[in-house]
Amino acid sequence: MALYLDTSALVKLVVRESESDELRTFVGAREMVSCQIARTELIRAIAREQPRSVPDAEDLIAEMTLIALSRLLTAQAAWVKPPVLRSLDALHVATAASLAGDLEALVTYDRRMAEAGQMAGLPVASPGMSAA
């Protein structure tokens, strides 16, 4: 079983935020998976927020399994609901869904992506985030 982490979760593993400790505990030694686009999203986010931590972001990405984009995934992402979900977020949800029985949880701190994951029937987790 693997955890699919979107970029909002990956940032919390590189930059200390309020949910970082609970997320680290939740992840533990589990396999971390994401889509190839996470590399670009994470490095760009860290370069904006905390440029000195870019090497830490690169190390994190090196420890993960990154799933390549394919025609099938991009086609599936086009139909992820709701239609207001941003395109890159839809790609994350479609990629997480492609893991089927191997997915323990889609880990995200993006409320829209969490809702989309739930609509797609995926288990969703946001360790440390209040339900408010």
Regions found by a protein language model. Give the residues of each.
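Noncatalytic, solvent-exposed loop/strand surfaces
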Residues: 28, 58-61, 72, 114
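Acidic active-site catalytic centers that drive phospho-/nucleotidyl reactions
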Residues: 6, 89, 110
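Alpha-helix capping/helix-boundary segments
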Residues: 9-10, 38, 73, 92, ...
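Short, well-structured N-terminal submotif of metal-dependent ribonuclease cores
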Residues: 1-34, 46-58, 122, 130-132
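A general structural signal for well-ordered alpha-helical segments in protein cores
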Residues: 20, 39, 43, 54-57, ...
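Acidic, PIN/NYN-like endoribonuclease modules and their adjacent C-terminal/linker elements
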Residues: 2, 35, 39, 67, ...
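Acidic catalytic patch
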Residues: 62-95
